[in-house]
Design a protein with these regions (language model features):
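C-terminal and inter-domain tail/linker signature
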Residues: 1-143
Length: 143
């Protein structure tokens, strides 16, 4: 079962996040699935997830997720990923900068009856905001 769940999550990355095929969500997610990404706002339904992911793709048209690690246990799969993209559209109210961002994140997936019922994304958006020039870059100072 773990191999099957990992395969479904890999499809989520390959087909939905990297290829932008949002219609695949209808196949991979339960009808009442919840998508939570605190950086992008309140929890969303399947349709809300499609809108948020489309907005992210609009802001970063070359957006690319690379799965660094994938672990499955019972009805859960956890992924560690690297996200990279260049901002060519508005993102969280920030006008396009043309800057490329790279950050790390983790996502937890909970399955019900072989489909994703819940997604929780935790990504380092502070680093993204620094790379976009919205927040100052912290530098170490000698003691």
């Amino acid at each position: 079962m773990s191999a099957e769940l990992k395969h479904l999550v890999q499809r989520f990355y390959d087909e939905v996040l990297n290829a932008g095929q949002l219609n695949v969500l209808d196949e991979l997610l339960t009808p009442n699935a919840i998508y939570r990404n605190p950086a992008l706002g309140l929890p969303a339904s399947v349709e809300g997830a499609k809108q948020r992911l489309a907005g992210l793709r609009s802001a970063f048209p070359d957006l690319r997720y690379t799965v660094e690690n994938i672990t499955a246990e019972g009805d859960r799969v956890v992924v560690q990923f690297v996200l990279e993209g260049t901002q060519h559209g508005e993102f969280l109210g920030i006008a396009p900068t043309g800057k490329t961002v790279r950050t790390l994140g983790m996502t937890s997936y909970r399955f019900t009856d072989g489909r994703i019922a819940e997604i929780l994304v935790l990504a380092d958006f502070v680093t993204v905001l620094r790379q976009l020039g919205v927040l100052p870059v912290l530098t170490a100072t000698p003691p």
